Amino acid sequence: MKFFVPAFLFAATAMALPGSGSAAGVAPHSNNEVEDAVNKCGDGAHMSCCNKINKNEGISQNNIGVLSNVLGAIGSEGLGLGQGCTQLDIPISVLGAAGLTDFLKKNCQQNIACCQNSNSQANGNLVGVAAPCVSFGGLL
């Protein structure tokens, strides 16, 4: 009995301690939110600097229907759609953790967004939503 209590306490303590790595198959989360947003932009889009971000434009909490409040539920401020966006050409040399943040601060004083590479049109698709540029605030 004397051996069981310390062994049980040791095992309980070891199980309660946080792990040092990430779970199998799950990538560890980076501390740099800008770098995370760039990774979320993906291959089918590019980073852009937008003059204006319209947050929750045309979306109200009183909408009724199957898809009501879907866009308003994305992020704390909803989905931000960019207007007047120009593509940012990011050199490979700045892709480090601190280099990317500094590059964006120097080259974009407005809003950073993720824009689709193709022209976005809402005509003829099932949902009828065209979101060419989405602010990083809606992605994080």
From Swiss-Prot:
A molecular function GO annotation: structural constituent of cell wall
Lineage, top ranks: Eukaryota, Fungi, Dikarya, Ascomycota, Pezizomycotina
Annotated Gene Ontology cellular component terms: extracellular region; fungal-type cell wall
Family from the record: Belongs to the fungal hydrophobin family.
Function: Aerial growth, conidiation, and dispersal of filamentous fungi in the environment rely upon a capability of their secreting small amphipathic proteins called hydrophobins (HPBs) with low sequence identity. Class I can self-assemble into an outermost layer of rodlet bundles on aerial cell surfaces, conferring cellular hydrophobicity that supports fungal growth, development and dispersal; whereas Class II form highly ordered films at water-air interfaces through intermolecular interactions but contribute nothing to the rodlet structure.
Signal peptide range in chain numbering: 1-23
Major subcellular location class: secreted
Phenotype when the gene is knocked out: Affects hydrophobicity only when HfbD, HfbE and HfbF are also deleted. Disruption of all 7 hydrophobins leads to altered germination kinetics, decreased survival under exposure to extreme cold stress and increased mycotoxins patulin and citrinin production.
Keyword Ribonucleoprotein assigned: no
Name listed for the protein in its UniProt record: Class I hydrophobin C
Cysteine pairs bridged by disulfides in the record: C41-C114, C49-C108, C50-C85, C115-C133
Annotated localization: Secreted; Secreted, Cell wall
Keywords: Cell wall, Disulfide bond, Secreted, Signal
Origin superkingdom: Eukaryota
